């Protein structure tokens, strides 16, 4: 059994790390390189770095920012935002990313999942899925930074991305994001029932108990932003709590 992972998320606009609520009301919280280094020192298992406006604005990837952040980072780095094709993936991996995360590109051209998995291996491909609840045990997939509904049912999509060769799922509840009231646990349970891929829970972590509940359900990693950016908890505090609750985490 692998140790559960604690992953700080750095949503960026340029070199600035930002945080909002349900993907809006964005404010700057720090510098990407400085925060990545700080979280690594604290014991983060991975870092996720996302350019949150690239797809919405039709921009390319932020290779220069990735190069800067990766240059002094030794934990795995997952990078996403603005990826449109295999060449974008190649540039980001060359810049120092260990994994790439695709969302909008995967929905607009599902074949890109197969292409990336074939060219670089499933182990470096994370498919990010942003959803909003639309009924009882029903969620709709959104793209373009959570702004555009697709009409695609989440359950159908998670099954398809696994079949096409994704290596991991980063699942975000837009409804819960930034509200600090807990993950959408019903959504996480649904994902685990429909897919065998490693699952990263995202959107809504506000307490140590929130993290524990998600990991207890069976997710492989918890992603959080606000609780780390605003100093609610440190990564050592999170890991100490989880260890005491019987969750296997890596301690430095």
Swiss-Prot record:
Pathway(s) where this gene product acts:
Amino-acid biosynthesis; L-histidine biosynthesis; L-histidine from 5-phospho-alpha-D-ribose 1-diphosphate: step 5/9
Write out the GO biological process terms.
Answer: L-histidine biosynthetic process
Which terms does the record give in the GO molecular function aspect?
Answer: imidazoleglycerol-phosphate synthase activity; lyase activity
Q: Which InterPro entries match?
A: Aldolase_TIM, His_biosynth, HisF, IGPS_HisA/HisF, RibuloseP-bd_barrel
**Principal localization?**
cytoplasm
Q: Which residues form the active site?
A: 11, 130
Q: Which domain of life is it from?
A: Bacteria
SUPFAM superfamilies associated with the record: Ribulose-phoshate binding barrel
Q: Write out the annotated subcellular location.
A: Cytoplasm
Q: Which UniProt keywords apply?
A: Amino-acid biosynthesis, Cytoplasm, Histidine biosynthesis, Lyase
Record's GO cellular component, any one? Answer: cytoplasm
EC annotation? 4.3.2.10
Q: Which reaction does it catalyse?
A: 5-[(5-phospho-1-deoxy-D-ribulos-1-ylimino)methylamino]-1-(5-phospho-beta-D-ribosyl)imidazole-4-carboxamide + L-glutamine = D-erythro-1-(imidazol-4-yl)glycerol 3-phosphate + 5-amino-1-(5-phospho-beta-D-ribosyl)imidazole-4-carboxamide + L-glutamate + H(+)
The Swiss-Prot or TrEMBL record describes its family as follows: Belongs to the HisA/HisF family.
- By its UniProt entry, which HAMAP family does this protein fall under? HisF
Could you describe the subunit structure of this protein? Heterodimer of HisH and HisF.
Q: What does this protein do?
A: IGPS catalyzes the conversion of PRFAR and glutamine to IGP, AICAR and glutamate. The HisF subunit catalyzes the cyclization activity that produces IGP and AICAR from PRFAR using the ammonia provided by the HisH subunit.
Q: Which PANTHER family match?
A: IMIDAZOLE GLYCEROL PHOSPHATE SYNTHASE HISHF, IMIDAZOLE GLYCEROL PHOSPHATE SYNTHASE SUBUNIT HISF/H IGP SYNTHASE SUBUNIT HISF/H
Full protein name: Imidazole glycerol phosphate synthase subunit HisF
Q: Native species of this protein?
A: Dictyoglomus thermophilum (strain ATCC 35947 / DSM 3960 / H-6-12)
